[in-house]
Amino acid sequence: MFKGFQKPKRLVANTETLTERYGMFTAQPFQRGFGTTIGNSLRRVLLSSIEGAAITAVRIEGVEHEFSPIPGVVEDATDIILNLKQIPFKISSDGIKTVRLSVDSHGDVRSGQIETDADVEVLDRDVHVATVSEGGKLNIEMRLKSGRGYVSADKNFDEDLALGYIPIDSVHSPVRKVNFAVEAARLGQMTDYDKLTLEVWTNGAVSPQDSIGYAAKLLKDHMTIFINFEEVPEQTEEISERGMDKMNEVLNRSVEELELSVRSYNCLKNANIQSIGELVQKTEAEMLRTKNFGRKSLNEIKEILANMGLSLGMRIDQHGRLVAPPPSAGGGPDFGPEDDGQDQIGE
């Protein structure tokens, strides 16, 4: 039922720009339309469903409600709470954790001054929290909890919340931003495939690579209930599907990557053969009719292609996939699926 349905073989990361908080990834080729389907699905799950830590309640000494001013502190409780929400945390254990911030000297108060235990990490230690005036002080207790997505202050209210704690709304997602783009991809002679590019920004609690993995696993787990049949492995005929997939990976590569001699490469260039996919579809007879192309160049190309699991005289179907070559015609050799690709031409 799904034979010939094109799917990407791997996800490729841009290693030049990859960091702990940013990653750009590409996957291709998808059947037309599936780049958008997969990209949009991953984006929605990445932004809404990856688990992360956030402050769910705050207790500020001398403050009864979130609109109260704080003696000796420039900001009021509302401003301080807004600043606290910007601090990214990472929790390595289950349950609720409590962290504290105590300042009794004047100056700028930063997130790096928060006191934590071994299970809690402040991922950005330079977030501004408050400004304490001369003679002022600031004492804050914060409750941290793991969760997913947005949680309102009402849902963060617990019956066991100690007196003086103010429940606040929280955003738990460690993924800050996701972009995706879909453009045309080429496979062999076919150009109606999709290439998906995905960009992910996180707060450092989870890497971009891992966040994509978690999102894909969530989607997979939700989709399995819709499969109402046993999957039957695809039967191979003349050439195994695994072998064909490996061959297809090199079709888009330029003939420049074959490291041919200058003479052989120039002959291919003059014949307007630019990709390996175009080359393998040529027969020996066709190649020998190329201007200045002789037996030595032919044997060189055959040897290099054989080392890659390819040969001359192969066919590419309408999906851009290699299929077994037909019996030879017009003087070309017959390379069956079990052929080792060595020169069989008699002199």
Swiss-Prot record:
This is DNA-directed RNA polymerase subunit alpha. Residues 336-347 have a biased composition (Acidic residues). It holds the Pfam family RNA_pol_A_CTD. Belongs to the RNA polymerase alpha chain family. Homodimer. The RNAP catalytic core consists of 2 alpha, 1 beta, 1 beta' and 1 omega subunit. When a sigma factor is associated with the core the holoenzyme is formed, which can initiate transcription. The gene is rpoA. Gene3D superfamilies: 5' to 3' exonuclease, C-terminal subdomain, DNA-directed RNA polymerase, insert domain, RNA polymerase, RBP11-like subunit. GO terms for biological process: DNA-templated transcription. DNA-dependent RNA polymerase catalyzes the transcription of DNA into RNA using the four ribonucleoside triphosphates as substrates. The keyword Protein biosynthesis does not apply. Its EC number is 2.7.7.6. InterPro entries: DNA-dir_RNA_pol_insert, DNA-dir_RNA_pol_RpoA/D/Rpb3, DNA-dir_RpoA, RBP11-like, RNAP_asu_C, RNApol_insert_sf. GO terms for cellular component: cytoplasm; DNA-directed RNA polymerase complex. Keywords: DNA-directed RNA polymerase, Nucleotidyltransferase, Transcription, Transferase. Residues 320-347 are annotated as: Disordered. The keyword Transferase applies. GO terms for molecular function: DNA binding; DNA-directed RNA polymerase activity; protein dimerization activity. It comes from the Bacteria. It catalyses: RNA(n) + a ribonucleoside 5'-triphosphate = RNA(n+1) + diphosphate.
